[in-house]
Amino acid sequence: MVSEPIEAAGKDAQVAFPGFRLLGALLGASAERIAKDRSSFGPLLETFVFSEVLKQASWFGESCALYHYRDKDQDEVDLVIETGSGALVGIEVKASATVNAGDFKGLRKLADACGDNFKLGVVLCDGGRPVPFGDRLVAAPMSCLWA
């Protein structure tokens, strides 16, 4: 099920690799390599979050679909969860401990496009505790995936 506002705003295909360990092995990623060149860490972290959300979605109790969102201006949201009833949650993944208002740009655009169906936008980061960034927007630590 795809919400009309998502289609109209520009849902774009993105390949999500189902196993971040396998992806890391294929890319030759190691702690040493990532420490020297962090450019591969962001995509690995996004894949890890996608895998965790996919696992948890299997026991959610309501059907849901996972998407990547990109609009005509190339603003994006790493992961959009849409329930069978049309509720939407956007997740942006940041490989950083610091978050600023600009990190919510794609989530704000998704919220505007989807109106009341948009329930929450989260920037997952390496921070310590949740911090509100406006109406239905919050920065939260990665550990919230298991809370």
Task: Please state what every model-predicted region is.
Residues M1-L88:
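Accessory nucleic acid-recognition modules appended to NTPase machines
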Residues V89-T98:
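Active-site ExK catalytic segment of metal-dependent nucleases
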Residues I81, V89-G90, K105-K109:
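Low-complexity, glycine/alanine/valine/leucine- and proline-rich hydrophobic stretches
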Residues K119-C125:
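Short, hydrophobic beta-strand segments that form beta-sheet elements in well-ordered domains
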Residues A97-L107:
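Active-site-adjacent loop/helix micro-motif of nuclease/hydrolase catalytic cores
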Residues A25-L26, N100-A101, P130-G134:
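Switch/connector loops and helix/strand junctions flanking conserved nucleotide-binding motifs
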Residues D126-A147:
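Domain-level recognition of nuclease-like catalytic cores that cleave nucleotide substrates
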Residues S58-W59, K109-N117:
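Arginine/glycine-rich "motif VI" loop of SF2 helicases in the C-terminal RecA-like domain
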